[in-house]
Structure formats: C-alpha cells, structure tokens
UniProtKB/Swiss-Prot annotation:
Lineage top rank: taxon: Eukaryota
Protein name (database record): Glutathione S-transferase U12
Gene: GSTU12
EC number: 2.5.1.18
Key words of the record: Detoxification, Nucleus, Stress response, Transferase
Taxonomic source organism: Arabidopsis thaliana (Mouse-ear cress)
Source lineage: Eukaryota, Viridiplantae, Streptophyta, Embryophyta, Tracheophyta
Name of the top EC class for this enzyme: transferase
Length: 254
C-alpha cells in the first residue's frame, strides 16, 4: 500500500510548510553535563524520548535530523554506529540508543517525585510486558497492513491488527482503574510506549479507509489517545494527524 520513496530531500518540517514548534526550555537538574537529543519531528520513537525528558524537566538541546532518508548526519552516525537511527540521547560522552532504553535511562538518571516506571516490581513487569507487545506484535501488525499488496491481504492483516488493539484495550481497562492513562492519573512508561502508535494508526486509517480505533471495540483507547495528545508533556512534540499524513505522502510517494 505504501511504497517507500528512497530519495526525497523535501521531508523537513519547514519544506512541508508546517509550523515548527519551539524548543521547550526546562529546568536544569543540577548537573552541568551536556544533554542532547537527536531526533526527527515525525518519528514516534523520538517523541517518546522528548516526552520523558519533559516529564523529568531535563534541560537539553534538541538536534533535528532533517533528511534521514537521503542521508544521516555525522553526529548521528557517530552516536549510533550500529543502527544509525534516531532517537539518540547524548549525556556527556555517553550515547544512549533505542527509544525505550532512553526513557528508562532518563527515569533513572534524573530521579524525581514523578517516576516514569512504576516502583512496584509487579507493576514494572506489567509495563515492560506491554512495551514488548507494542514494539513487537503491535508494530508488526501495523507495518503488515501498511505494506499489504492488495485489498484482500489488507483486510486479513487488518483483522490481526484489530485483535492486537483489542488486547491492548483490555490491558488499558484493567490497568487504568478508571483513570485517564494506563497507570491511572498520569502518564507513565506504558503510555509513552503506546503513544508511538498514535501517528502510524492515523496514517493507515487515512490510506486504507479502515477505522482501527472504534467506539465499539476500543472505547478506552480512543479516550486515552485524546488525553495523551493533550497532555502538557506530549502536546509540544506530537504532530497533528494532518501533519503525520502529509509526511507519509511525501515519504511514500502517495
């Protein structure tokens, strides 16, 4: 369904004529060690890192990779020589790669009254289980729908995605205990993890014509997504649905 355009030097937010968000300046944590985050504005995984840094009030420099499809910056290649992907958190002379690894690192390196990961071992295990589910089965099913070659295959794969979303809906209903988020009253590790599907789901809904988040099957996730987008730690970094769709059109030559 979505054919990747290998060479496109017009994928920056400025080129798409989308208003560039201002970098939020946050309070220092008392350390003089430099903190940088390398990301791309439309990357759901970079958004995870930005939300974690915001929640922990970590002052940092955000470095935008403006054209990751055409080429990678020297800083990105040096900081993540194995995968050469965003996000990368640079803390002094240490580079931390992979979004969930970064979220956990931020939570542990800047202790505060607000903990991203739960403190109880059983709840931490629950959070890590669903993080693995999202980055494994759920994203695999999203990618499968996006890459379907025909309508028949797409409908079969859409059923698999809906099953995975139904499982996530059940987890939300059990863990939220009537609150707005997976952890109850405030966003935490599972919310930050699941937040990475908001953009991709919006894009495949737009291109496939299939609604995956539906009031009859995922009412909790629909309300959760609205609350998550509006949260003060998320809103400055989360692109709108229209922005995600416009980016996908450029990226996949649609």
């Amino acid at each position: 369904m979505l054919k990747n355009k290998k060479s496109d030097n017009s994928l920056s937010r400025d080129t798409l004529q989308i208003k560039k968000r201002k970098k939020t300046t946050m309070a220092q944590n008392g350390s003089n060690t430099t903190v940088k985050l390398i990301g791309t504005w439309a990357s759901p995984f970079a958004i995870r890192a930005q939300v974690a840094l915001h929640l922990k009030s970590v002052e940092h420099e955000y470095v935008e990779e403006t054209d990751v499809l055409k080429g990678k910056s020297d800083l990105l290649i040096k900081s993540n020589p194995i995968h050469k992907k965003v996000p990368v958190l640079i803390h002094g002379d240490v580079s931390i790669c992979e979004s969930l690894n970064i979220v956990q690192y931020v939570d542990e390196s800047w202790p505060s009254d607000l903990s991203i990961l739960p403190t109880l071992p059983s709840e931490r295990a629950f959070a890590r289980f669903w993080a693995h589910f999202v980055d494994g089965k759920l994203f695999e099913s999203i990618d499968a729908v996006a890459g379907a070659k025909d309508d028949a295959a797409r409908m079969t794969l859409a059923g698999n995605l809906m099953e995975n979303l139904a499982a996530l809906e059940e987890a939300f209903q059990k863990s939220s205990k009537g609150g707005d988020f997976f952890g109850g009253g405030n966003i935490g590790f599972v919310d930050i993890t699941v937040g990475a599907i908001v953009g991709p789901i919006s894009v495949i809904e737009a291109f496939s014509g299939v609604k995956f988040l539906r009031p009859d099957t995922t009412p909790g996730l629909i309300q959760w997504a609205e609350k998550f987008r509006a949260h003060e730690a998320v809103k400055p970094y989360m692109p709108t649905v229209a922005e995600f769709i416009e980016f996908a059109k450029k990226k996949f030559s649609v």
